[in-house]
């Protein structure tokens, strides 16, 4: 069983990337489970025809963990992709990472981990104990960073590199960075900047996903791009990402940058703007 986790800043496109990746993988004849590890609980929505499935944490609160079965928490989506949403606490109460911990404990008790590949879609703004659990407990052995060329997105990706590096010091866990996915925001020299960042931390870009309105059209139809526009160039990009991940053998313990190094790197790839807002 192959277990991978996609980490990145909130709003960067992790869930869109994860759902299209899962769709591409199941189209290859693999059995796939996608686990959304974000309180927004929308990771699997496009695999479920737009349905927001009940979260594990909500079900535990409502019915008690001991009363739940596998069919209560695992839902079947596009072409058989098995979908799970960890969920989070009520606003202003508790720890968001708790949903991930509770979900994994329940899925283990119910013997749910038996797919060819499991895709964890994980919030990466704050890599606290709960959100780091897929790495810390050895569930996800291959980590992929989803980022754009925006500084805050790169900052989150760099923090995840710090978490991987720290967790990898525990010889009992095998947790490695498999590559960087550039989800473009159409910034100047964005692919070069993200490629330079990947190189600096010891890794590489494994996919460049261009910004496209096709994603919005697909999601308005409650579908992934893979399902909505299977012959499009964007669909081919997601299929290529699936191929890269399935054949990847290049895994590293990353070397995170200091914040000053990261900012210097970002500045070197952005156009100079004077006090009047004019590019040079």
Curated annotation (Swiss-Prot):
Binds 1 [4Fe-4S] cluster per dimer. PROSITE patterns: NIFH_FRXC_1, NIFH_FRXC_2, NIFH_FRXC_3. GO terms for molecular function: 4 iron, 4 sulfur cluster binding; ATP binding; metal ion binding; nitrogenase activity. Its EC number is 1.18.6.1. It catalyses: N2 + 8 reduced [2Fe-2S]-[ferredoxin] + 16 ATP + 16 H2O = H2 + 8 oxidized [2Fe-2S]-[ferredoxin] + 2 NH4(+) + 16 ADP + 16 phosphate + 6 H(+). ATP binds at residues 8-15. Homodimer. HAMAP family: NifH (MF_00533). Its cofactor is [4Fe-4S] cluster. InterPro entries: NifH/chlL_CS, NifH/frxC, Nitrogenase_Fe_NifH, P-loop_NTPase. It comes from Methanospirillum hungatei JF-1 (strain ATCC 27890 / DSM 864 / NBRC 100397 / JF-1). Disulfide bonds: none annotated. Keywords: 4Fe-4S, ADP-ribosylation, ATP-binding, Iron, Iron-sulfur, Metal-binding, Nitrogen fixation, Nucleotide-binding, Oxidoreductase. The gene is nifH. [4Fe-4S] cluster binds at residues 95, 128. This is Nitrogenase iron protein. The reversible ADP-ribosylation of Arg-98 inactivates the nitrogenase reductase and regulates nitrogenase activity. The key enzymatic reactions in nitrogen fixation are catalyzed by the nitrogenase complex, which has 2 components: the iron protein and the molybdenum-iron protein. Signal peptide: none annotated.
